[in-house]
Amino acid sequence: MSEIQSLTERALADVAAAQTPDQLEALRVALLGKSGSITAQLKQLGTLPADQRKAAGEAINLSRDALTAALAERKNTLETAALDARLAGERIDVTLPGRRSERGGLHPVTRTLERIVEIFARLGYELSDGPEIEDDWHNFEALNFPPHHPARAMHDTFYFGDGRLLRTHTSGVQVRYMDAHKPPLHMIAAGKVYRSDSDQTHSPMFHQLEGLLVDEHSTFADLKGTLSEFVRAFFERDFEMRFRPSYFPFVEPGAEVDIAWQQPDGSTRWLEVLGCGMVHPNVLRNVGIDPERYTGFAFGLGVERFAMLRYGVNDLRAFFENDVRFLRQFA
């Protein structure tokens, strides 16, 4: 038994001196593994005289239990030390200056569009959406565009090889809406539209919002009242407005809306902001609505145009150049 005691004392000292989990595992295998020294002592019990086996077995079991407990304790100590070291390395010094996150903001065109939609929602209009890739029927034919109309030309419209096109206005959404709903109708459609045009006040892609009302007793006076209320609500002040006769294939009569806009030098000039009119009877017939019973009005505006006026931007292209210095002004 003195041999077992001596082996145990040396083994406990080695366990206490182990500095890594790998060293500790190697000691466990050397002591308690299938070929370990303690296991070898158990295998030799059968060679001892019968009167010594019990005492020797008890001593070996006590040694094994002591070593197992020591190994577990040392393993826990090493793991705790490793965790403490890792946490110390990852510790955040709360006294150091923080890194401020960049504050995001909505694009001025998005802010303008949301404001317009909110105003018309208060007036009872439902927002509807439609595809940006349209067919000739929804973009032109159903809206009373004659075959020879210049808007159908390649130099004004982006066509695909199969005859489809990038919508030139959101009016196609109105056609789809009238196909799917019965009067009375109060709807607006907003989104990207595409035209082959690019200069200081035009872009090949821009945002448009159009509105439509169809009911049994709608009049041009209702249209004027609606647009007057919208302009007042958007700019938060009253404007002198005028409605000039104009031609659009899908309305009759048609008009363009001007507001008396004050210049930086204090002078006032008429500024076009909207197109509108009473829905043409042919458009109503094309969607199965009886023009003898129902009338309606429609209107449309360029969202970028209203954004330019609201924020004092002179060049439309600034909205699409993604210059953070410019956009941050509106965040």
Curated annotation (Swiss-Prot):
Pfam (any one): Phe_tRNA-synt_N
Molecular functions per Gene Ontology: ATP binding; magnesium ion binding; phenylalanine-tRNA ligase activity; tRNA binding
Enzyme class, first EC level, given as a word: ligase
Cell compartments where the protein resides: Cytoplasm
Keywords of this entry: Aminoacyl-tRNA synthetase, ATP-binding, Cytoplasm, Ligase, Magnesium, Metal-binding, Nucleotide-binding, Protein biosynthesis
EC number(s) reported in the record: 6.1.1.20
GO CC terms: cytoplasm
Positions of Mg(2+) binding: E252
Reactions listed under catalytic activity: tRNA(Phe) + L-phenylalanine + ATP = L-phenylalanyl-tRNA(Phe) + AMP + diphosphate + H(+)
Cofactor-binding details, from the entry: Binds 2 magnesium ions per tetramer.
Disulfide bonds: none
Superkingdom of source: Bacteria
Biological process according to GO: phenylalanyl-tRNA aminoacylation
Keyword NADP in record: no
Nucleotide-binding recorded as keyword: yes
Cofactor list: Mg(2+)
UniProt family annotation: Belongs to the class-II aminoacyl-tRNA synthetase family. Phe-tRNA synthetase alpha subunit type 1 subfamily.
Subunit-level organization: Tetramer of two alpha and two beta subunits.
Protein name listed in UniProt: Phenylalanine--tRNA ligase alpha subunit
Lineage start: Bacteria, Pseudomonadati, Pseudomonadota, Gammaproteobacteria, Lysobacterales
